């Protein structure tokens, strides 16, 4: 599996995972913290791991995104290809609440509790790391 970038259609940000556990979006394609590895747990279920830090994208019980040192149930996301060819990533452990990974127009992460289907903030395009 080649590493990928997660490009958000809302403002053109790449999802970034910092070593300190913070998650946000950046428009800098050369940022080392935006390279992500996807691991399929089962069909449509993925772990998203930072290549640089080795941490996993996770969503806590308040809907906040953070980076986890090890893969837990909070790190499992339901990956779905939508009609517009963008993907959405819904927290599996909070699936009954419909909480999605999202980035706001200012590049900050959107709490899962504030996301809902149809928002641009939750639409992501997995892109290859190299632009060539």
Curated annotation (Swiss-Prot):
Instruction: Report the transmembrane regions from the record.
Output: none
Question: Which cell locations does it reside in?
Answer: Secreted; Cytoplasm; Cytoplasm, Cell cortex; Cytoplasm, Cytosol
Which cellular component terms (GO) are annotated to the entry? Answer: cell cortex; cytosol; extracellular region; extracellular space; nucleus
Annotated heparin binding sites: 10, 108-120
Alphabetical list of Pfam families matching this protein: FGF (PF00167)
Q: Name one GO molecular function term.
A: growth factor activity
Question: What does the protein in this record do?
Answer: Plays an important role in the regulation of cell survival, cell division, angiogenesis, cell differentiation and cell migration. Functions as a potent mitogen in vitro. Acts as a ligand for FGFR1 and integrins. Binds to FGFR1 in the presence of heparin leading to FGFR1 dimerization and activation via sequential autophosphorylation on tyrosine residues which act as docking sites for interacting proteins, leading to the activation of several signaling cascades. Binds to integrins.
Task: Please identify the protein, giving its name as recorded.
Answer: Fibroblast growth factor 1
**Source species of the chain:** Notophthalmus viridescens
State the encoding gene.
fgf1
């Amino acid at each position: 599996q080649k590493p990928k970038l997660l490009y958000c259609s809302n403002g053109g940000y790449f999802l970034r995972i910092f070593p300190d556990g913070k998650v946000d979006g950046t428009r800098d394609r050369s940022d080392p913290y935006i390279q992500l590895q996807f691991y399929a747990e089962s069909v449509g279920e993925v772990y998203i791991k930072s290549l640089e830090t080795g941490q996993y994208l996770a969503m806590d019980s308040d809907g906040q995104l953070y980076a986890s040192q090890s893969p837990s149930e909070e790190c499992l996301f339901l990956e779905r290809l939508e009609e517009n060819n963008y993907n959405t990533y819904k927290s599996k452990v909070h699936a009954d609440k419909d909480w999605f990974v999202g980035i706001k127009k200012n590049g900050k992460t959107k709490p899962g509790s504030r996301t809902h289907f149809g928002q641009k903030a939750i639409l992501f395009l997995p892109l290859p790391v190299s632009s060539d």
